[in-house]
Amino acid sequence: MTTTEGRTGRLRVPPLFGAALLMAMSAAGPGFITQTASFTVLYGASFACAVVVSMIIDVAVQLNVWRILGISGQRAQDLASKVFPGAGQVLTTFVVLGAVVFNIGNIAGTGLGLHNLLGVDPRIGAAISGILAIGIFLVRSVMTAVDRVMVVLGFVKIALIIALVIATAPPVGQAAVGTVDPKGLPFLPILTLIGGTVGGFITYSGAHRLIDAGLTGVSNLKRINRGAWTGILVACVLRIVLFLGFFGVVATGAHLANKNDAAGSSFLAAFGTVGLHLFGLVFWAAGMTSVIGNSYTTATFLQSYVKPVRTHFNRAVIVLIGLATIIFIAAGQTPQSMLVFAGAINGLVLPIGLAIILWVALRRRDLIAGYRYPKLLLGVGLAAWLFTAYAAVDSLTSLGSIFS
């Protein structure tokens, strides 16, 4: 982590690292925590395969997205409109719809987190968290505040997850075997995990932040790559240690007190009563970072087509946060099922946006300043697109089973 201190003594985060952390923290939000806990209980060591596949897809997707958007200096929807008329509006519609569902799940996650941390009702916890998130976008230097919040909450999340791994001492050898020889692992968990950590708004959060910081063009290619790899590595480490922490609990055969809250029950099994409070802090931190990243990225899409969003960007972000909070409080859907469902929806969105990005690399060099795109990177991206497209189609009929 590279940070500097200004004259005021306050934490200053370089925009490049801020973009990387925005992507990484959004990718390892409450959706991933919920998915990892739930599916690890169901599939055990075999779920390691899904984690590894999601990491591979993440590398292929993010390296292509950051490079194409970074070099072009255009956000995804604007670039899409130049490739195919109307494509930008279609992409924005899908991303925004997925993001709204995901953000309701994120708000639900903050409510569940404060419920475990402080004992408050999840809806009250969600309301408190929504107000705090809105407060961040009321300050004068919004993105500076966002970067600082990401650093602090990210540190809390990473530290507590590592503590879970140390406490559970997972059988790494079994997890390694499950990675290469998964048994009884269907496509839906893989799609859901990819959607919750790579798909939807998450695909573009870091790159859009990079563009807002002005780090664009071929001259900034090294910095673009460094930012992409930083975000990818942080997200991958979080995924690995979180899975290992939950697998450590599952491997011992520990009884989970509440199967509808597999993540919280795992912390309870690992640390005792205090574990629920630690889990609450982790889940709340994950929810807050995802709410912020989601709302910001959604607004960057809407600003191309909705003038009030463009002229009052921060207010638009506040409206998005408030909308998600109100919908969750009114709907009363259980946090766990909503988070898993949101991940599956985003997994269906992923192939659409990635196809446009890869088309620019393959056929529209004029949009990336004539840059000769690496064939290896393009090939990896195409392979990732084929996998996500097949998985999305294959799992369309399975989404209803999430709520059964």
Residues covered by each model-derived region:
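Membrane-interface "cap" regions at the ends of multi-pass membrane proteins
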Residues: 1-34, 189-192, 216-230
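Hydrophobic transmembrane alpha-helices that form the core helical bundles
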Residues: 71, 88-119, 126-130, 284-304, ...
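Membrane-interface loop-to-helix entry segments
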Residues: 129, 138-168, 181-184, 342-350, ...
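Hydrophobic alpha-helical segments and their helix-loop junctions in multi-pass secondary transporters
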Residues: 155-181, 190-208, 354-368, 391-403
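Flexible loop linkers connecting adjacent transmembrane helices
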Residues: 2-3, 36-38, 63-87, 114, ...
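Transmembrane alpha-helical segments of multi-pass small-molecule transport proteins
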Residues: 92-93, 117-139, 155-165, 307-330, ...
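Selective recognition of specific alpha-helical transmembrane segments in multi-pass small-molecule
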Residues: 49-64, 157, 225-250, 388
